[in-house]
């Protein structure tokens, strides 16, 4: 039997009475954000809105973005990535479970030195996919050109943020490359592999 989203007591500073709020609302107020599903326009817009609003509220407190995502749409992912670079607070990215495809792109977009993977997390990178089989000939050519531009954009970001040569990143993106947490660290996608002391970071 579903129980819905758990609620917790929360009182803002200066308020006498605490109120029951859903747990995600409470966590968001502590700058703890979650990408726990396929990335689409809706979840991207929610995370962008939270980052912008909370940045206006306080420009000094870092964000912690927990990622467990199979990937998703490229354009909403790029929008979220750009927002992470735009907002004044640093964005810590934390991979738990799986960060695949656009999930790994968001993971690598965290503040350099503040990207972390849990010990048993998995990371997967590959080139952007398309629905060519649904397109007419003219649409196919236009979509292929756009896809090539998107691939170049993603590749440049991975090169810039991992410190790996262009040829290494390009080769990795030719196919699905699955990495353990330590392999992701060696690839420069994350900076740290979490241990029992990582709770001190949040």
UniProtKB/Swiss-Prot annotation:
One of the protein's GO biological processes: protein quality control for misfolded or incompletely synthesized proteins
Subunit structure: Component of the chloroplastic Clp protease core complex.
Record's subcellular location: Plastid, Chloroplast stroma
Catalytic activities: Hydrolysis of proteins to small peptides in the presence of ATP and magnesium. alpha-casein is the usual test substrate. In the absence of ATP, only oligopeptides shorter than five residues are hydrolyzed (such as succinyl-Leu-Tyr-|-NHMec, and Leu-Tyr-Leu-|-Tyr-Trp, in which cleavage of the -Tyr-|-Leu- and -Tyr-|-Trp bonds also occurs)
Pfam family, one: CLP_protease
Top EC category: hydrolase
HAMAP family: ClpP
EC code(s) of this entry: 3.4.21.92
Gene that encodes the chain: clpP
Similarity comment text for this entry: Belongs to the peptidase S14 family.
Protein keywords: Chloroplast, Hydrolase, Plastid, Protease, Serine protease
Gene Ontology cellular component terms for the protein in this record: chloroplast stroma; endopeptidase Clp complex
Name of the featured protein: ATP-dependent Clp protease proteolytic subunit
InterPro entries to which the protein is assigned, alphabetical: ClpP (IPR001907), ClpP/crotonase-like_dom_sf (IPR029045), ClpP/TepA (IPR023562), ClpP_His_AS (IPR033135), ClpP_Ser_AS (IPR018215)
Role: Cleaves peptides in various proteins in a process that requires ATP hydrolysis. Has a chymotrypsin-like activity. Plays a major role in the degradation of misfolded proteins.
